[in-house]
A protein has these predicted regions:
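Conserved, well-structured functional cores that handle cations and Mg-NTP chemistry
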Residues: 9-222, 226-253, 260, 264-282, ...
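An anionic, glycine-rich sequence signature occurring as long contiguous blocks
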Residues: 162-193, 249, 254-368, 450, ...
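Short, well-ordered loop/turn and helix-capping segments at boundaries between secondary-structure elements
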Residues: 352, 365, 369, 374, ...
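Short, solvent-exposed helix-loop connector elements
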Residues: 348, 354-363, 378-395, 414
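Short, hydrophobic/amphipathic alpha-helical patches that form generic packing surfaces
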Residues: 56-65, 155, 397-411, 446-450
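Long, charge-rich low-complexity segments
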Residues: 111-112, 118, 442-488
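Catalytic-loop motifs flanking and including active-site residues across diverse enzymes
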Residues: 152, 368, 372, 395-401
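Conserved nucleotidyltransferase catalytic core and NTase-mimicking acidic/glycine-rich helix/loop elements
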Residues: 404-443
């Protein structure tokens, strides 16, 4: 880490305005957060009460706290009882989807996002101790790289020129959750009665379909191999006239010439006869194509990064894919060879005349969903929240997305009204200055809105509250067991 001298700190390098940091506005970030919340307050009104003040307090807690952002600890920063916050997050009937829809409307209205945006589909798993949490089960946890007791969410992120955020999400419920034996557990944990089993790919398509019916503009849909290898999903995207660049595994089979798919002549007329590939040409795995002598690689500069420039080798060619007797589809096979020599593959429905630079751009968008996941978890506290019931999971998602959008909108506004001093880059000897990160902006908010310090009286009240709750819990357990208190 660089150590700065006193003389350096007095130079332009440490001048806040040179970095686009408006000192006066930093001091009023709390007011800015309040005004942001006011736009969403109606989303938290129910038929019986207005719970919007809980939303403001919870949002503030997510942004200002750094660890252990659970319901009880956030409640303490709000000056509320944990029970009231628990009720707001778990049982109150406000709609998380209504909040997410308003976020997307505001993202769509942002002039900076008029073109060049990408939707990115991904999943993220969190470890769970047992199946007592909605959606939990032994399933693949990508972070751990193994099958483990986990709760998995599918998420849709929006990315644009260095900005990224979740804009939608769905909780994946494994198929065994829909068995008759789990009916009571589904009801206990608030799973909607009309919820049916859906694969992660189907949940992903539901979100894409939902967002594409709104006004949010984007130029490409990207996804990892879990979703990209789905012929069904790629077909759905094409039918909806949405451009995609979908990562696929190295063993994905494609044809270099259009195959003939039909019912074999000798089987025509039979009721159960199914179409199949009749061509003599055999399919090839995409990793075989990358090694062909006719495959030409060219270096493409995709974008500037904080580490320099993303310049990798790319190659692309037209191929055909088919599955289960469906008519073949012509797609781009996009291949990227990174700096370590590893080759990554994607299929895209970009037009046949699309230049390699455009294909390379689409191939390199998926990394931003990892940035969105990191910000949601590390900065906003998604992985610290412990939603046991279905409504709590949806409510947590809505408030985490609100927090991320508030930070992103603040950065966008400052970037537009308080740009970097061009002399600063020259003084530092670089051609590009780093933008504010979500972590940077949150640090400023935490300074402008410091958490309340715990007094002796406050700590005493918390201890008594804890003891009272333990006493009531024991009383409840004894009542459940049918015991009676002894007279002494």
């Amino acid at each position: 880490m660089w150590a700065s001298t006193e003389n350096e700190k007095k130079s332009k390098v440490f001048n806040p305005s040179a970095w686009g940091l408006p000192s006066a506005e930093i001091k009023t970030l709390g007011q800015r957060l309040y005004q942001f919340w006011e736009r969403y307050a109606d989303c938290f009104e129910t038929t019986t009460r207005d719970a919007s003040h809980y939303a403001l307090g919870f949002l503030s807690g997510l942004l200002r706290m750094t660890t252990e952002r659970n319901f009880s600890n956030i409640a303490r920063t709000m000056g509320e009882t944990p029970q009231n916050v628990q009720h707001f997050m778990t049982n109150s009937p406000w709609s998380g989807q209504e909040v997410l829809q308003q976020i997307r409307e505001e993202v769509a209205a942002e002039p900076a996002f008029a073109k060049g945006g990408a939707l990115i589909l991904d999943e993220s798993a969190d470890e769970k101790g047992s199946e007592k949490t909605v959606g939990a089960g032994r399933q693949h946890n990508g972070r751990l790289g193994k099958i483990d007791m986990s709760q998995v969410g599918t998420f849709l992120a929006y990315a644009h020129s260095g900005d990224w955020m979740w804009i939608d999400g769905e909780l994946f419920l494994p198929e065994h959750w829909f068995t008759p034996q789990m009916a009571k557990e589904r009801k206990r944990l608030g799973v909607p009665p009309d919820r049916k089993f859906a694969t992660k790919v189907q949940l992903g398509w539901q979100m894409i379909e939902r967002v594409s019916s709104e006004d949010l503009l984007f130029e490409v849909v990207c996804c990892d191999t879990l979703y990209g290898r789905s012929f069904w999903l790629r077909r759905k995207l094409s039918e909806a006239k949405l451009i995609y660049c979908a990562d696929v595994p190295a063993n994905t089979q494609v044809y270099l010439e259009k195959p003939v798919v039909d019912v074999p002549p000798q089987l025509k007329g039979r009721r159960k006869a199914k179409p199949r590939v009749l061509s003599e040409e055999k399919p090839m795995e995409v990793r075989q194509i990358s090694g062909l002598g006719e495959t030409v690689w060219r270096q493409v500069e995709v974008r500037a990064t904080e580490r320099g420039y993303l310049r990798d080798e790319f190659s692309a060619r037209r191929v055909w894919t088919t599955q289960n007797g469906e008519q073949p589809v012509e797609e781009w096979l996009v291949m990227r060879r990174d700096g370590e020599g590893k080759i990554h593959y994607a299929l895209s429905n970009e037009p046949a005349e699309a230049p390699l630079e455009r294909l390379a751009w689409g191939k390199c968008q998926r990394v931003f969903v990892e940035c969105a996941n990191r910000d949601a978890k590390s900065e906003i506290g998604w992985d610290e929240l412990r939603a046991q019931k279905f409504p709590a999971w949806e409510h947590e998602l809505a408030l985490v997305c609100m927090a991320t959008w508030f930070m992103t909108q603040t950065k966008l506004d400052w970037r537009k009204r308080h740009p970097h001093d061009p002399k600063l880059a020259r003084e530092l000897g670089v051609d590009l200055l780093p933008p504010l990160s979500l972590a940077n902006t949150r640090e400023l908010l935490r300074a402008a809105m410091p958490l309340p310090q715990l007094t002796v009286e406050g700590a005493t009240d918390l201890v008594i509250e804890h003891l009272v709750n333990r006493t009531r819990s024991r009383k409840s357990r004894l009542k459940t067991l049918g015991h009676k208190h002894s007279p002494t």
